[in-house]
């Protein structure tokens, strides 16, 4: 017979009573009556915040943008194939946020800032909300520093400043991504953190861009955020905000950042898909009523911080794709009205072999010469005027048979200036090379050449300068002024190179 010791039993009971925790844990839960097309309807999930994260039984996470009288509409961050009708859902009490750190540089991540490049986990000690409020008026200062793109047409006539939002707009296959990636390549050694956000692109296109960055040594100062065409609409919609949160992390640490959104047309389409599935009322072109706010709250996060916040900056060139050059469509007009200028890329110019295919006549930067160094201002003013006059004359010359000598000369100069703006892809130019190129063109040094020889002559001149006249680049870089000494050195270099060029060509 087992001996029962009352003192042991009483000790066990006493210990259990002391360990009893009276704390009641309240969990906000609901059930799934309906799921499909990346949308779940949740019944019984009371007191859920707008945009709160919710977690399903199978581990899938969703965002709750719609709170209705009898249910909550949730968009899923995944395919949701394992979510079953009647399964439970738990509110997390958190708004969507991502981890941030310096370790993200050189990595490829998705819209949830999770690495997808196979290089292992990214260490991060802090996090930021995906949707942060934009800096206020007092937190900003006016844009005054240039963000060099390395493209003559932009840096001379449509200059972009640090903290500006300059739209890149054009039809498909007109070189929009090339302009953006060249700008990122040109930031090498400029102490600028770059973020490339690819929304709804083909995986092969994104891989090509990443390879270009890696080959040219640009990946070490760049973060690539990508959600491909086969990603859920929710993640395509979130990707730009994730990129902005990463850029803000560096901006508020007194650094300069450049974030490219490629492209916001696809983000708007993903948002339209989400909204229609959530049964929100459609508006113009079936977009929901708040599609303007979708882009304005994203682009307003780009800023040039004031001195109290460390003078960091976030420059945002968004890309918009037009259909058959129609810039009066809903999304293009929205983004044009939000941004500080636009660069129009023309399919006609692209097909005519003028690349980058920038239509200088209708492109504009609302910051203007405030975002140029003095040396560029000195040479660029004449270029824009001469190209504008050439465009008018060219249209007139199509109908006139006999033109006087002055008009013929002006047309010849204009054709050579247009050649001067042509550049190969992934070959951005330093500001001193641009100043030399523009000065050569606007002062008529290329007028004696055949139109087809101009590009070759200028490429060889840019190669000749660093080896034979290195002091020219030193003066421009150190003083940022096109001084008389620099002009004399350049004139001498042009004269010497012209003799070499003509002797080579005559052979």
Swiss-Prot record:
Alphabetized UniProt keyword annotations: ATP synthesis, ATP-binding, CF(1), Hydrogen ion transport, Ion transport, Membrane, Nucleotide-binding, Plastid, Translocase, Transport
GO molecular function: ADP binding; ATP binding; proton-transporting ATP synthase activity, rotational mechanism
Catalytic activity: ATP + H2O + 4 H(+)(in) = ADP + phosphate + 5 H(+)(out)
EC number: 7.1.2.2
Annotated positions binding ATP: 170-177
Organism: Aneura mirabilis (Parasitic liverwort)
Role summary: Produces ATP from ADP in the presence of a proton gradient across the membrane. The alpha chain is a regulatory subunit.
InterPro entries: ATP_synth_asu-like_sf, ATP_synth_asu_C, ATP_synth_asu_C_sf, ATP_synth_F1_a_nt-bd_dom, ATP_synth_F1_asu, ATPase_a/bsu_AS, ATPase_F1/V1/A1_a/bsu_N, ATPase_F1/V1/A1_a/bsu_N_sf
Species classification: Eukaryota, Viridiplantae, Streptophyta, Embryophyta, Marchantiophyta
Topological category with respect to the lipid bilayer: Peripheral membrane protein
Enzyme class: translocase
First and last residue of the signal peptide: none
Subcellular location: Plastid membrane
Pfam families in UniProt: ATP-synt_ab, ATP-synt_ab_C, ATP-synt_ab_N
Recorded family membership: Belongs to the ATPase alpha/beta chains family.
Name recorded for this polypeptide: ATP synthase subunit alpha, plastid
NCBIfam families: atpA, PRK13343.1
Protein origin, superkingdom: Eukaryota
GO cellular component term, pick one: plastid membrane
Subunit note: F-type ATPases have 2 components, CF(1) - the catalytic core - and CF(0) - the membrane proton channel. CF(1) has five subunits: alpha(3), beta(3), gamma(1), delta(1), epsilon(1). CF(0) has four main subunits: a, b, b' and c.
Annotated site residues (Required for activity) in this chain: 363
